[in-house]
Amino acid sequence: MRVRDFSHTGITVSNFNRAVQFYWDVFGCPLVGVADTPSPRVKSFFGVAADAPSCKIGWIRVPGGATLEIFEFQPQQQPSAGPWNRVGLTHISFNVRNTQRWHDHLVAKGVEIVSKPEKSPRGHTFFFVKDFDGNLIELMDLGYMYHVLKWLGPLGGWIFRRGIYKNYYR
């Protein structure tokens, strides 16, 4: 069995409305759904130990089909940053065209820039920014490889699984 495609990434945010506005103003990603989670569910499913916890959930549509699922909990815990070699998620990434133009756009929007656009050894360009809560976001221009991966990705996966990467499969 195989998954069909990538669905979503969940991010806990400090301010629901600010997150909606940020992802719309900065990246053009609209809010497409909102739900309020009942207190008993916040306690049992999310494990928030408080008298009357709440959770607002929103779905922000990213061009291409994936979604950012945002959560605002009450009460909140303070964010904690970890080093990249910590096991777990490190960042989200958006495919873009022209990373320098995106860099300039985000500087003008006042977004915290972590790194300037640079070229990888494989030829794509990328840079990192942070959202208002400090979540790391990569913007990457894969160049021609975007189309190669989109259209030939399944074939490449089949070939590589049987070829140069076969030792990773049992």
Where are these regions (language model features)?
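Short amphipathic alpha-helical segments
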Residues: 5-9, 88-90
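A short, polar/charged loop-to-alpha-helix boundary motif
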Residues: 144-159
